[in-house]
Amino acid sequence: MSDQIIVSTRAFPASGTQDLGFVYGTSCFSANFFKDTFSAIRNTTIGGELGNYTKLMDEGIKSAKERMIENAKALGADGVYAVSIATPQVASGAAEIIMYGTAFKYVN
């Protein structure tokens, strides 16, 4: 899976593929206490984008995607389709990301 095919469509359009099953990647990052406190104050007084949280989410999504791809590679996959992202909250001040989909490979 060196050329990663990652798509969000529910049905992969190409014929000649075989589903390999469900794959996922998870990530959980904690915010820095001081940055978290500053972001909370800024959110209630100034407004605007909370760059610390945006960066946290970006890092979490990237990490979850990499782990999902690793799990797909372990199955011998050429890609993953029906990719979705969930962001459950398991801890305050943390970014939790689950990225999941269906691994597939091309068959001759």
Segments predicted by a language model, with ranges:
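N-terminal presequence-like segments and the immediate start of the first folded domain
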Residues: 1-35, 74-78, 95-108
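Short, solvent-exposed loop/turn elements at beta->coil junctions and helix N-caps
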Residues: 10-12, 85-90
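Short alpha-helical interface elements
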Residues: 47-48, 62, 66, 70, ...
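Short, well-ordered alpha-helical segments
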Residues: 23, 36-84
